């Protein structure tokens, strides 16, 4: 029986006889003494075997190779001074193996080197195809253990300190297409009818509040059939919470305590409280988006009033058509950013135009306080306007001002993108900083120009601000998102709990009373039976762990992720199914495979 994990052994175990299990990470033959690095999920420890000291294990050690699975029994010994290894936690000790038992070998050539001693860069598609080998590597193994620690900390806080109940909600539910596409599951028992996999437990957790389960949480699996990005998966995990009889301030306070608990337990980091807050409007005005990275400056400054009446047509046309002009001050930008990068063909120009802008205007501030720019701008700015512009942007000699002009949404999107790119390129972002903040007071709705109707910005169960009930189309939502270093890690809201308000919201997004009853009648009916005030939040577990692990993709904190084409390279899912299975489900496929034509 195993007595210890490899990575847990220290000098405090000297003289103990231990039994370890693991994989051979590396084998070295040093003139009659064979050294093995034995690896398990906790780390690596050195095993030694020689014909003189450990004659029983030596013949087995001679035949071992990388990734063989073995059992080792031996005595923990102190390493000689010349072989100490400060790079690993077990570097002061080694195990002289009285016994080595080969449990399994490797019968195929390894697709890549698993050993932590090799720095081989492996293509992600190969890693995903052989994910069971990839997960043996220290980085991925540590990420999954970190994920476990985060979930454990969540559970302990919510259950032991805050009296929450963990309650499971259905995976097979009904389709309520609002937002992302559902994954559909045909019913064999009810031909022609379909289940949907849940995009979130939203409706069920609200019904649990109606049922009196006043503090609910769940580590929930969610499914969305949407176009994928680096931080999206078709199936993902969230910490889902709902609370009755709590206002927004109480919910935010509890969640700040939860996040602080997670960081303290998992990373031994004390986060300052309370977390800063910005309204949605403030965030858009200063950063151009609703998930700002506040670890650095380069904030947007609105200069529409100052520059909208100049003779420079790009600026005046933007303001006269209802748009805006905004600027970013880049300290020392005269030295760090050339004109070539700003003009057509440059990398910054490309970033801006990919975000929808037609180009970038710029002004360079010289040592004498004068400006240097393209003639059309300079010719249309008088001395007083230049002075006011420098005051508004706090620009100094040597600084560069970058401008966006046009419809406000495009200006915000393009300058927000430039801001992030410049923050990275200029080294303004502290990779170890942790900046958390709440974004509040979102709009209830946004206009879908394609479908010519309003859509809920979050979801249609979010409660409108009580001061804005007169005209819901312009109402603020009692919604809140938690943002960490420019990534939204959680979002929630107070919920509607009165039938008449919920019906009014459904009508605003274009649902007729009949459609609302057909899709959500069970919820509306529940509101007739004494529904308490309630609210909640959901955290993207994958994103949170990604940030804690300092990874760039959530695929590196998920055991078996899908690709950006929503496929599993390991199991080759999705895959075709037998026609007999489809017939049992009363389903027929209309897909016609494309015929490959040889050149």
From Swiss-Prot:
Its EC number is 6.1.1.23. The record marks 30 as: Important for tRNA non-discrimination. Keywords: Aminoacyl-tRNA synthetase, ATP-binding, Cytoplasm, Ligase, Nucleotide-binding, Protein biosynthesis. It comes from the Bacteria. One of its GO terms (biological process) is aspartyl-tRNA aminoacylation. One of its GO terms (cellular component) is cytoplasm. The keyword Ribonucleoprotein does not apply. L-aspartate binds at residues 178, 224, 458, 495. It is an enzyme of class 6 (ligase). ATP binds at residues 224-226, 233, 488, 540-543. It catalyses: tRNA(Asx) + L-aspartate + ATP = L-aspartyl-tRNA(Asx) + AMP + diphosphate. Residues 202-205 are annotated as: Aspartate. Gene3D superfamilies: Bira Bifunctional Protein, Domain 2, GAD-like domain, Nucleic acid-binding proteins. One of its GO terms (molecular function) is aspartate-tRNA(Asn) ligase activity. It is found in: Cytoplasm. Signal peptide: none annotated. Homodimer. Aspartyl-tRNA synthetase with relaxed tRNA specificity since it is able to aspartylate not only its cognate tRNA(Asp) but also tRNA(Asn). Reaction proceeds in two steps: L-aspartate is first activated by ATP to form Asp-AMP and then transferred to the acceptor end of tRNA(Asp/Asn). NCBIfam families: aspS_bact (TIGR00459), PRK00476.1 (NF001750). Belongs to the class-II aminoacyl-tRNA synthetase family. Type 1 subfamily. This is Aspartate--tRNA(Asp/Asn) ligase.
């Amino acid at each position: 029986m195993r007595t210890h994990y490899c990575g847990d052994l220290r000098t405090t175990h000297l003289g103990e006889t231990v039994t370890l299990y693991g994989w051979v990470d590396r084998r070295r033959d040093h003139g009659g003494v064979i050294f093995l690095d034995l690896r398990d999920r906790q780390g690596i420890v050195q095993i030694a075997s020689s014909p003189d000291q450990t004659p029983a294990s030596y013949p087995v050690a001679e035949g071992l190779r990388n990734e063989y699975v073995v059992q080792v029994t031996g005595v923990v010994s102190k390493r000689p001074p010349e072989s100490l290894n400060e790079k690993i936690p077990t570097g002061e000790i080694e195990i002289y193996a009285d016994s080595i038992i080969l449990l399994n070998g490797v019968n195929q050539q390894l697709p890549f080197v698993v050993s932590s001693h090799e720095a081989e860069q492996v293509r992600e598609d190969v890693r995903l195809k052989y994910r069971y080998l990839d997960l043996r590597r220290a980085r991925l193994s540590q990420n999954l253990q970190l994920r476990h620690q985060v979930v454990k900390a969540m559970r302990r806080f919510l259950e032991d300190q805050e009296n929450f109940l963990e309650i499971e909600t259905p995976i097979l539910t009904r389709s309520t297409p609002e937002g992302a596409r559902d994954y559909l599951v045909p019913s064999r028992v009810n031909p022609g009818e379909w289940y949907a996999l849940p995009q979130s437990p939203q409706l069920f957790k609200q019904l649990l509040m109606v049922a009196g389960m006043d503090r609910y949480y769940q580590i929930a699996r969610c499914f969305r059939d949407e176009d994928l990005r680096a931080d999206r998966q078709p199936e993902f995990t969230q910490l889902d919470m709902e609370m009755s009889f709590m206002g927004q301030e109480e919910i935010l306070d509890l969640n700040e305590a939860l996040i602080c608990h997670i960081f303290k337990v998992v990373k031994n980091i004390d986060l300052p409280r309370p977390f800063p807050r910005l309204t949605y409007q403030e965030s858009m005005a200063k950063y151009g988006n609703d998930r700002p990275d506040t670890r650095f400056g380069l904030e947007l400054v609105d200069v529409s009033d100052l520059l909208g009446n100049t003779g420079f047509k790009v600026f005046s046309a933007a303001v006269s058509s209802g748009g805006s002009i905004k600027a970013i001050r880049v300290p020392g930008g005269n030295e760090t950013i050339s004109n070539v990068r700003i003009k057509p063909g440059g990398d910054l120009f490309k970033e801006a135009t990919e975000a929808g802008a037609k180009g970038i205007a710029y002004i360079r501030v010289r040592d004498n306080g004068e400006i240097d720019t393209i003639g059309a701008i300079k010719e249309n700015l008088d001395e007083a306007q230049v002075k006011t512009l420098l005051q508004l942007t706090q620009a100094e000699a040597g600084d560069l001002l970058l401008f966006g002009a046009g419809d406000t949404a495009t200006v915000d999107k393009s300058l927000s993108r430039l801001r992030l790119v410049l923050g990275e390129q200029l080294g303004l972002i502290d990779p170890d900083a942790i900046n958390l903040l709440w974004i509040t007071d979102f709009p209830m709705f946004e206009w879908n120009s394609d479908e010519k109707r309003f859509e809920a910005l979050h979801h249609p169960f979010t409660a409108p601000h009580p001061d804005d009930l007169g005209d819901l189309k312009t109402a603020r939502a009692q919604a809140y998102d938690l943002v960490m270093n420019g990534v939204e890690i959680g979002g929630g809201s107070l919920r509607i709990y009165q039938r008449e308000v919920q019906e009014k919201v459904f009508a605003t997004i274009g649902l007729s009373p009949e459609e609302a009853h057909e899709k959500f009648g069970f919820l509306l009916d529940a509101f007739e039976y004494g529904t308490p005030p309630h609210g909640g939040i959901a955290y993207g577990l994958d994103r949170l762990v990604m940030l804690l692990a300092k990874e760039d993709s959530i695929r590196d904190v998920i055991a078996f992720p899908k690709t950006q084409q929503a496929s599993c390279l390991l199991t080759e899912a999705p895959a075709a199914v037998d026609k007999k299975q489809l017939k049992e489900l009363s389903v027929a496929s209309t897909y016609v495979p494309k015929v490959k034509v040889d050149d």
